Amino acid sequence: MALPAHLQETFSPEEVQFLVEEETVKIFPRITTRQKRRDKNRGAYGDVDTKWSMLTTENDNLNNMVAMRSTEVKLWIALLLKQQNKCSIVAPSWLTLRELNRKIQQETNNSDRFCDLPWNWLVIANVLFAKAADDFHDPVHELRSKVQDLREIRQTKVLKGLKQLNASHLQLDNLSLLEINELRPFIVRTMDKLREIHDSANTDGGVVDGDEEEI
């Protein structure tokens, strides 16, 4: 079955989030999944190899967690544990008021390039705001505002960059997946039209040259 035209050119929001949820994040688990057994000779408990899995997964960290000891798991697992109140999610280092203000300043001071941000920064921010708002040290409403400011500044720079668009390429380094996904349909159609104009101009030029030679 053929996909709708708009899904042939871009990822759907669900597809974008699915890709991003495969990224690793740090958590503080509130449960212990590491198993122990009693040493009959010494009367003590020792760590042993896991005989079962919390989930059907190869994620060793997931099956070796100790309560309140930080570990790293896939984002989708962290969200599942968070939903069950079994962990706290540690916000990325760039997702603080201090760092966002610094990124905004960099974007403002450099009109010809974008500051370095993770490829998934917008999706990560929105997911954590929605699912783990209580895990942030900074007020979430202020973080949302800064993320929106940063996004709008970058969108303005993108529009300025489109003035440099030609039939061969457009260089927009450091854009995130979501930003590129939003721009792609417009850019693809515009570049296709520019190629048509370019090819048409070359063809017309060739015909004119031929007529001049015959004359």
UniProtKB/Swiss-Prot annotation:
Chief site of localization: nucleus
Subcellular locations according to the entry: Nucleus
InterPro entries named among the record's database cross-references: GINS_A (IPR021151), GINS_bundle-like_dom_sf (IPR036224), GINS_Psf2 (IPR007257), PSF2_N (IPR056784)
Keyword Chloroplast assigned: no
Disulfide bonds: none
Gene Ontology BP term (one): chromosome segregation
Nucleus is among the record's keywords: yes
GO CC, alphabetical: chromatin; CMG complex; GINS complex; nuclear replication fork
Keywords: Chromosome partition, DNA replication, Nucleus
Record's subunit section: Component of the GINS complex which is a heterotetramer of SLD5, PSF1, PSF2 and PSF3.
Function: The GINS complex plays an essential role in the initiation of DNA replication. Has a role in chromosome segregation.
Family: Belongs to the GINS2/PSF2 family.
Protein name: DNA replication complex GINS protein PSF2
Gene: PSF2
